[in-house]
A protein has these predicted regions:
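Signature of N-terminal electron-transfer/Fe-S-associated modules in redox systems
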Residues: 1-190
Length: 190
């Protein structure tokens, strides 16, 4: 049996450039170090910060977080792979997270997942070839009273039918930064 070896790393920084920037280190030092008893306890906030900045956690960033927190790289990797919400490979512009809790299952989340899988021509955990969508299932979105629920990037959509989900997906703007919670009138915020 032959092993297929594929280098899945993506270089985001030029040689010598750090992904864990000085600004990020300062934020971790000032905001999180005082709140936690050890540097190890800052691993989760550090991983969240990296993922929020880049959309995923590159291998280089894992190594830099480990060095910054004075941990073994394996400890940081173990933490990142233990939790579902961390991404160690790039994902699509839109992360479609379908809740698979009991409440959502009873109310039709399986139909939503199956429909998205067929519509986007991907399996759960995969990204479309155009890198626009990544489809995943999560154990619970905490919206049992309004099931089924789907999280699109960071916007929660509740009581969804297949038709409503279709309309939602078809109306998503090309630029995910232009997408926001449709229930908020952004004009009143500014």
């Amino acid at each position: 049996m032959a092993w297929l070896v594929e280098d899945r790393r993506t270089q985001l920084a030029a040689a010598g450039e750090s992904l864990l920037t000085e600004a990020m280190k300062t934020e971790l030092r000032e905001k999180y170090f005082p709140r936690y008893p050890t540097k190890r306890a800052v691993t989760l906030p550090a991983l969240h910060l990296v993922q929020h900045t880049y959309g995923w956690i590159p291998t280089q960033a894992l190594q830099e977080v480990a060095q910054f927190l004075e941990l073994a790289p394996a400890e940081v990797l173990d933490t990142a792979t233990f939790y579902e919400e961390y991404w160690l490979k790039p994902k699509g512009k839109y992360l479609l997270q379908v809740c698979r809790s009991l409440s959502c299952e009873i109310c039709g989340s399986r139909d939503l997942t199956d429909h998205l899988s067929k519509k986007l021509k991907v399996e759960v955990g995969e990204t479309t070839p155009d890198k626009r969508f990544t489809l995943i299932e999560l154990e619970c979105l905490g919206s049992c009273g309004t099931a089924p629920a789907v999280l699109v990037n960071e916007v929660l959509h509740e009581n969804l039918t297949v038709k409503q989900l279709d309309e939602l997906i078809d109306k998503l703007p090309e630029d995910p930064h232009a997408y926001h919670d449709p229930t908020i009138d952004w004009k009143d915020e500014h």
